[in-house]
Swiss-Prot record:
Originating organism: Lychas mucronatus (Chinese swimming scorpion)
GO biological process, one term: defense response
GO MF terms held by the record: sodium channel inhibitor activity; toxin activity
Pfam family, one: Toxin_3
Protein name per the record: Neurotoxin LmNaTx19
Role, per record: Binds voltage-independently at site-3 of voltage-gated sodium channels (Nav) and inhibits the inactivation of the activated channels, thereby blocking neuronal transmission.
Similarity comment text for this entry: Belongs to the long (4 C-C) scorpion toxin superfamily. Sodium channel inhibitor family. Alpha subfamily.
Annotated localization: Secreted
Cited InterPro entries: LCN-type_CS_alpha_beta_dom, Scorpion_toxin-like, Scorpion_toxin-like_sf, Scorpion_toxinL, Scorpion_toxinL/defensin
Amino acid sequence: MNHLILIVAMCLMVIGVQCLKDGYLYDDVDCKFSCWDNEYCRKLCKSKKAVGGYCWRWRFSCYCTGLPDNEKTEGTYKCGQGRFLMGKDK
């Protein structure tokens, strides 16, 4: 009986754990969010429920820390591809 209580308690602890990840934010057309300053990225990351964020100037992209698992942090390297056709939206 004690083992059952211990197993249930451990399962509840595992279920309650929310995993967080770090990474670059991508928009709906697989482009990273460009930046020049940390404040913009901090606000953008916080709006996505991240713990924090900053502008990584080497890539001019917003990098977020502590993002929820459901946020997109990987792209397909096809930023904006197929979004415009001869200057007009599809």
